[in-house]
Amino acid sequence: MKSTQQLGQEAREFEFNPNIPLHLYLKTCVTLLNNASECFQRGDKSLSYFYYFRYVDLCTNKLPNHPTIRSTSTGLDNDSKLYVQEYKQLLRLEVPHILKIMEELKTELDAMYERHKVSLANNIASPISYKHNNRMDALLHDYYTERGCTGHSMQHKTSLHKNENFNERINLMKDSFMGRAPNGSQEVRNVSNTFYPDLPTLS
């Protein structure tokens, strides 16, 4: 999800060509508003905000530099005068209304963006820890099953994960594989050669 600041920056990134006739840019304004309205109706408020922002930027920052807008009325033909009047009407009536819509959208999108960041932060560490715990529990279960521990005995041994941290459980597995029985017992079990085979010596 993008922030409203990112959406605004992207909305400004378009090439304005003053040689394009004013009436074509006025049609572009209508298209931008239609796109914004359609996106809003289908629930894509981020894209709706993008189109509204581009519309306002075109009307207030780009079009004032258009040669037809900057020309005096005496130097324009009748059609151009009508286009200038239409543009001024946009500035007086439509733009203020669109700015209010954008303000409401911005408030909603900013709140959604903050919730999105919090959700991402909460989901980073917890799945990793959960997977490690489940993996160690499975290793302990397989280890004691192979050695004939069942029922209460296995439950007692595997319950270590409830009150020992990850490193302590690693040490428990290491002691068992090296022939030392868990929980301080003097019993020594035979370790199968299938565990941790010798690695070849590097020359």
From Swiss-Prot:
Name of the protein in question: Regulator of free ubiquitin chains 1
PANTHER family: AMSH-LIKE PROTEASE, FI19924P1
Family recorded in the similarity comment: Belongs to the RFU1 family.
Localization per Swiss-Prot or TrEMBL: Endosome
GO cellular component, one term: membrane
The encoding gene: RFU1
Alphabetized UniProt keyword annotations: Endosome, Protease inhibitor, Thiol protease inhibitor
Keyword NAD listed: no
Source species of the chain: Candida glabrata (strain ATCC 2001 / BCRC 20586 / JCM 3761 / NBRC 0622 / NRRL Y-65 / CBS 138)
One GO term (biological process): ubiquitin recycling
Pfam family, one: USP8_dimer
Chain segments annotated as transmembrane: none
Record function comment: Inhibitor of the DOA4 deubiquitinase involved in the regulation of protein degradation by the proteasome and maintenance of a normal level of free ubiquitin.
InterPro entries, alphabetized: USP8_dimer
MF (Gene Ontology): cysteine-type endopeptidase inhibitor activity; K63-linked deubiquitinase activity
